[in-house]
């Protein structure tokens, strides 16, 4: 089990018991200053600074006692934001019709970066479909190969 999975299993039930939505987490390891960033949201969308402080105050002692991460790190609790990262296929499904930027772990059809309108999510094949920005082609990206999928806000 990865470090991210261990932390998720430890903290997700706490965040959800407080009435918040666990959106996901990122762990950026660095020998000088690692960051554990936890994204939370509300049913209504948007989370306030008071909520972030409350969640942080609940999670810090648990992390101190359980120590799922043994190196020094900074805990950040954050809103997913308008340009939110999509961590799961279920999250992707909520944003069908949105513009998404995907960076893959390995090249797919000769490219690692794709941007387009998300048109479908296939849970059986574990893929997301994008109509590319030029509108000329549709690609079906294997979700397990996506390093990061992020919403591109339209203003």
From Swiss-Prot:
| Domain of life where this protein originates | Bacteria
Which Gene Ontology biological process is one annotated for this entry? Answer: translation
Q: What does this protein do?
A: Required for maturation of 30S ribosomal subunits.
The principal localisation class reads cytoplasm
UniProt cross-references to PANTHER family, sorted A to Z:
RIBOSOME MATURATION FACTOR RIMP
Its name, as the record gives it, is Ribosome maturation factor RimP
InterPro entries assigned to the protein according to its UniProt record, in alphabetical order: Ribosome_maturation_RimP, RimP_C, RimP_C_sf, RimP_N, RimP_N_sf
Question: Which locations, inside or outside the cell, does it occupy?
Answer: Cytoplasm
Would you identify the family this protein belongs to, as annotated?
Answer: Belongs to the RimP family.
An annotated GO cellular component of this protein is: cytosol
Record CDD domains: YlxS_C
* Keyword annotations from UniProtKB, A to Z: Cytoplasm, Ribosome biogenesis
């Amino acid at each position: 089990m990865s470090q991210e999975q261990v932390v998720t299993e430890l903290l997700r039930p706490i965040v959800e018991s407080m009435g918040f939505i666990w959106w996901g987490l990122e762990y950026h390891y660095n020998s000088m200053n690692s960051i554990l960033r936890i994204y939370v949201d509300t049913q209504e969308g948007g989370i306030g600074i008071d909520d972030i402080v409350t969640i942080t105050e609940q999670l810090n002692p648990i992390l101190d006692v359980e120590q799922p991460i043994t190196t020094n790190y900074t805990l950040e609790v954050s809103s997913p934001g308008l340009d939110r990262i999509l961590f799961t296929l279920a999250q992707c499904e909520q944003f069908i019709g949105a513009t998404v930027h995907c960076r893959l772990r390995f090249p797919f059809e000769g490219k690692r970066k794709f941007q387009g309108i998300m048109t479908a999510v296939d849970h059986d094949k574990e893929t997301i479909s994008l109509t590319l920005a030029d509108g000329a082609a549709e690609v079906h990206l294997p979700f397990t190969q996506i390093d990061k999928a992020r919403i591109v806000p339209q203003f």
